[in-house]
Amino acid sequence: MKASRFFIGTLKEAPADAEIVSHKLMVRAGMIRRVAGGIYNYLPVGLRSIRKVEAIVREEMNRAGAIELLMPAVQPAELWQESGRWEQYGPELLRFKDRKDNDFVIGPTHEEVVTDIARNQIKSYRQMPVNFYQIQTKFRDEIRPRFGVMRGREFLMKDAYSFDKDTAGLNESYRKMYDAYVRIFTRLGLEFRAVAADSGSIGGNFSHEFHVIADTGEDAIAYCPTSDFAANIEAAEALPLIAERAAPAEAMEKVATPGKAKCEAVAELLAIPLERTIKSIVLATENEGAEPTIWLIMLRGDHDLNEIKVSKLPGLKNHRFATEQEIVDWFGTPPGYLGPVGTKKPVKVIADRTVANMSDFVVGANEVDYHIAGVNWGRDLPEPEVADVRDVKKGDPSPDGKGTIDICRGIEVGHVFQLGTKYSDAMGATFLDESGKPQPMLMGCYGVGITRILGAAIEQNFDDKGIIWPESIAPFEVVLCPMGYDRSDMVREAADKLYAELAAAGIDVILDDRGERPGVMFADWELIGVPHRLVIGERGLKEGKIEYQGRRDAEATLLPADEAAATVTEKIRAALAH
């Protein structure tokens, strides 16, 4: 490829609405241009990287035995109504009517469509296992699209769906996809972690997320530096304390805490550790034809509520936060001073595991400007229902017993789920087993965000000059920058020869023959992020040298002109081999 025949749309400034590095650099490098909120054109530079991501994903899907197909972006509402997600999915599902007043959606995912394929095409256990995959455009009507391709409305995704006759088969399909994802993200050249996760709106039982590690990541990941444990903070278990609960040492006492509604302020006023205070969170669940059930969730003052964990507790699947009026009606006080002692109406109390192990703690007195100190279980309060309802913290014991938890940020780029029979049951996807009896198919689903990978890779690989692509997904692997290509026969002949040698070796090379000044050439290709650069000039050629600089190198080095192609080829192949 020669630059004069390619489109290079670099910009000096990022748009005002670009908040994070990847969005700024993708626009400045000429990879994307905004069409509407969360919807982008992918310009030639961006599309080249997308195609390289797709190629790696396809190779590993095929290697794992998955079979490619293509399903429509537009899906009939009937399929979503069958699965129950027509109501569940909410406004993120873009719905529309055709000219005949039929309801349709633009698919954010394809479980319904692929289940429809399976129930019509798979009749016998002999046809399984089977794993279908596609690379297709999706649409999710985000309320606030932002961060460029990281949270867009239209995006490109690889989604795969496995169908098995039994749990053993599903486990094997899941393992194959998990292993394929490890290979994919390794080949992409990204630092990543596979973490245990919650299944969210997709549903199902067992799942893992694949996160690219980056400081700008939206998700918090709990991991153990001395073991393989890693989990999304939403799913990471907070272990109960090993030590036995201490015996009461204080009498229960009502204390004045004027204007101190927060645990931190109460701890400071009473000169006690924050860890001795209780954070009281009030939830409500509806009862048809009756007043709601009110729940008091008790956390240690320095801990945070994990709503995902709470929603999995019996009776709390559809919980909401109580209104201020409900709090006053049940506790006799507005938020900030409430607690489990002396409520106006009965409430259901759930104590976090850590709270259940506490003694002599401080709670709200259900009276403005007052708290109660020296509270103890069994003496002042009945023993509570106990559950893990908090986020883990740095320093907590690792659930695998092999060290302590640390926290990092991650960008989710892949997710694998064991769905079981969730969609098969809802949509009647059955097969005949060995005895001729109908059984529901066991499903797994496996997604990779193709366009999101580009943003995540940039968040992990950039400097003040621009993007630093891993070789595997760079739009070009090497750029040739000839000094005076249009003026010097020596330079032009050497550049053309080097270009031909690299191309013959299978290297993705671009020759910048635009006639730009060196500073412009260098700035463009550093911004675009090409991993390797060779500079050809008359002075160097007279000495038999060509200048080489890797995108991560602080300084350039000189290579023998007749060895430059072989040297760079070896560097690229070595990088791609990892």
From Swiss-Prot:
Any Gene Ontology CC annotation: cytosol
Enzyme nomenclature, EC number: 6.1.1.15
Predominant localisation class: cytoplasm
Annotated GO MF terms: aminoacyl-tRNA deacylase activity; ATP binding; proline-tRNA ligase activity
InterPro entries membership: aa-tRNA-synt_IIb, aa-tRNA-synth_II, aa-tRNA-synth_II/BPL/LPL, Anticodon-bd, Anticodon-bd_dom_sf, Pro-tRNA-ligase_IIa, Pro-tRNA-synth_IIa_bac-type, Pro-tRNA-Synthase_IIa_type1
Gene3D superfamilies per the UniProt record, alphabetical: Anticodon-binding domain (3.40.50.800), Bira Bifunctional Protein, Domain 2 (3.30.930.10), YbaK/aminoacyl-tRNA synthetase-associated domain (3.90.960.10)
CDD domains attached to this UniProt entry: ProRS-INS, ProRS_anticodon_short, ProRS_core_prok
GO aspect biological process, one term: prolyl-tRNA aminoacylation
Localization (cell): Cytoplasm
Pfam families listed in its UniProt record: HGTP_anticodon, tRNA-synt_2b, tRNA_edit
Catalytic activity annotation: tRNA(Pro) + L-proline + ATP = L-prolyl-tRNA(Pro) + AMP + diphosphate
Free-text function comment from the UniProt entry: Catalyzes the attachment of proline to tRNA(Pro) in a two-step reaction: proline is first activated by ATP to form Pro-AMP and then transferred to the acceptor end of tRNA(Pro). As ProRS can inadvertently accommodate and process non-cognate amino acids such as alanine and cysteine, to avoid such errors it has two additional distinct editing activities against alanine. One activity is designated as 'pretransfer' editing and involves the tRNA(Pro)-independent hydrolysis of activated Ala-AMP.
Subunit annotation: Homodimer.
NCBIfam families: PRK09194.1, proS_fam_II
Notes concerning its domains: Consists of three domains: the N-terminal catalytic domain, the editing domain and the C-terminal anticodon-binding domain.
Name listed for the protein in its UniProt record: Proline--tRNA ligase
